[in-house]
């Protein structure tokens, strides 16, 4: 898999290594009985040897002529012994870096590696991915040649159908691919080619969700001026068909926003009408459409075998619309069964499936035979939906006003009772203070009376003594 930049360490001059590689190719081609590569390049290598010995500036055009012959014959490397394939390709990659434009040779090498390695049927894909990864990592991050190498890696993974190899590539697709696309400065056609290659590999590896993502990204590369072309139509039909049949795709906004998909309104009107039904309509409209227009007759029968999948998805979308539009936030089982055309005993199954799809949230009440809606996804948001939101906001406002009124009443009652309690406490405190004052006065009065009584008694006692 692509990793940090790698450097190949191979000793020898260009002429020496080219001659050695030519001999190796001749050994692999000996059964063909053709002219040897070494004999063809020897006249071209002689002046290069002289330049290397005199430390003169090498003739790049001369090197390119040598490389053309070597690369043209290099397809035979796929027949090399398993233990020699990687080292042989590494030597060829090293030689290609001497070219004036390595890209014109690397794209051809990638095409060789995308073909089966006949000498190792079991490990051929792993060997090819290893070699391509080495090539990728020897190139600078901004080198546009990486584009062709990356396409080669993706092609090998797609052809092998290896889930393990694709899973190893996925982190790079998420973390690095956007940066690579920017640094490689691809045009719309190249970007579309890359996204479609990734989509094909994801589909082969059993990842339809990632495949759908890259199909949409490929669709977005189509310029508005080319939206009505045959290529754009084919891609739009593929993207639309994939989205309609994918069990986890319920948002069709990216499709309706595409110029290429909008162009289907003229070229494939029935398919576009079906998209509009899935975007905003219900099961009733879908069944009426299918009755009038059999799926087998839409755009060459691309949806001929998708009847059950489309109907099931339409049921989920219909339930989402019901949940979003009900003002009471409560859906009786009978209403759901009638709208989805299912038996009453299957209602809970369809509600659970819709919850799993992320379209609604809520609680099933078996006792009351109803679905209590907590959240519902709006499939489209227009004037009707704004009116529903306004109505619900008014209901919430009235509810909040009632709550606020209750809170105010309770607050006033609390304040009133608090004041009354404080006043009662103050009166009680004053009463206790008065009682203490009265008791203290009585004690002082009794003490004074006792003293006066004693004073009156003393003269009498003195008189008696006299």
From Swiss-Prot:
It is found in: Cytoplasm. SMART domains: PINT (SM00088). One of its GO terms (molecular function) is translation initiation factor activity. The keyword Membrane does not apply. Disulfide bonds: none annotated. InterPro entries: COPS7/eIF3m, eIF3m, eIF3m_C_helix, PCI_dom. Residues 433-443 have a biased composition (Basic and acidic residues). Component of the eukaryotic translation initiation factor 3 (eIF-3) complex. Component of the eukaryotic translation initiation factor 3 (eIF-3) complex, which is involved in protein synthesis of a specialized repertoire of mRNAs and, together with other initiation factors, stimulates binding of mRNA and methionyl-tRNAi to the 40S ribosome. The eIF-3 complex specifically targets and initiates translation of a subset of mRNAs involved in cell proliferation. This is Eukaryotic translation initiation factor 3 subunit M.
